[in-house]
Amino acid sequence: MEGREVTGCSFRVPRYATVHLEGTSCQRVWPYGKHLFMQFDDRIVHTHLKMEGTWAIHYVGDRWRRPAHSARVVLALANRPRDIELVGHWLGLVEVFGLDDYYESIADLGPDILLPRWDREEAVRRISMRPGRSIGAALLDQGNVAGIGNEYRAEACFIAGVHPAARVEDIDYEHVLDVARRIMWANKDSPIRVTTGVRRAGETTYVFGRNNAPCRRCGTLIQKGFLGGVDAGGDEGELERVIWWCPVCQPAPVGSNRGQPGWR
């Protein structure tokens, strides 16, 4: 994308319907946590997939693989022999603003866990400010750490041997954070997420999506429940998500009933 001229532009959200980027050039494309930023001369397009969004790339004129009514952003870029078209479907967030507003747009986010030189100390500090909170909720909160989603949360907790409902103050939460960073860094350039080291279909995760399947370590059936947590950096309003864990490898916190399926 970088260096290509915009030859067509359509923002299909009311607030930005009159924005035109034709004639500008793409200067830079970069992620911050779960957010994607694209700079076109002196303006930035900011998007977030949330739960349903996706980006598709086509040649201009080709049939889209997803329905037209789901498109929120359409950008045509100069290319030979045919221009290419980027289509953002079902995007949960779309913004356009000037360069000076970039830092304000990420002000509520914690350090990006996938930056080469990320601010681990700041992430640790933010998590430690709420010691009574569950580690599962703390990891998912983008105000603590930007970038961790539900799959990596579940897998990091399993690999670290920590129940997702365990309180921050009762565990080595820095170790869990380091595990999350390590498995995410290992997957950052891969089209397939793998935490087990095995790329075969159905064998890529330890607990995520494996309810009632045997634990890959001890054979105990993986359990599934719900864990509350506010994702301040993008998934506003989604206060709980499904979580998976092994009741043997990740024992429930003492005095809780959170080792039972369906706990909330």
Regions found by a protein language model. Give the residues of each.
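Structured catalytic/nucleic-acid-binding cores of DNA maintenance enzymes
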Residues: 1-264
